[in-house]
Design a protein with these regions (language model features):
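Conserved alpha-helical scaffold segments that buttress catalytic/binding sites
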Residues: 1-174
Length: 174
């Protein structure tokens, strides 16, 4: 994408020029299917999987509150062992439902939902979706959330994070 070429990759503090040290590529946006969360999640997971299988390590920036789950779902099947997730955001995104939606502000609840000791909420199961269960190699202990806080946090999500012993760091802890 042309906008990526506008920015300089040199760090004055570190004395490092990222484009000289690393092979970087902006893969662009992944197209979504408005109004269809399942097809959108499939599209996102396939794109991330393709990037990962090409030998690149995806660093994913942007999107909405739901995309954490399909991003990790695209990588998790290709990882031997557990996946580590670093989530940088002000929102904890750990509750099971929000505004009657299962993926708005909820991706990390569902990503880490398939592990021993995790109490699964199935009260919404009058329908079934492929993301009703977590990813088996994404344990809660491997999720680190940085920058969490402010007045737009979530009491239910914070409670789930404490129950699952998620490392949720606010700006004072970083």
């Amino acid at each position: 994408r042309r906008i990526s070429a506008v920015y300089d990759g040199y760090s004055v503090d570190g004395g490092v020029d990222l484009p000289e040290e690393l092979e970087l590529c902006d893969a662009g946006d992944i197209f979504v299917i408005p109004g269809n969360i399942e097809k959108t999640f499939d599209q996102v997971s396939k794109a991330i999987s393709h990037i990962f299988c090409s030998g690149a390590f995806p660093i994913i920036c942007g999107g909405d509150h739901s995309l954490g789950y399909p991003n990790v779902r695209g990588i998790a099947p290709h990882i031997d062992g557990n996946v580590g997730i670093i989530h940088i955001d002000r929102h904890i995104d750990m509750q099971d439902m929000d505004m009657d939606e299962r993926m708005h502000t909820t991706p990390w609840f569902w990503t880490t939902n398939d592990h021993e000791g995790v109490e699964r909420n199935t009260s919404h199961h009058n329908h079934s979706h492929m993301h009703d269960v977590g990813l088996s190699n994404c344990p809660p202990k491997n999720l680190v959330q940085m920058g969490i806080g402010g007045w737009y946090g979530s009491r239910p999500g914070s409670s789930v994070a404490r129950e699952r012993v998620i490392a949720a760091l606010n700006e004072l802890n970083i």
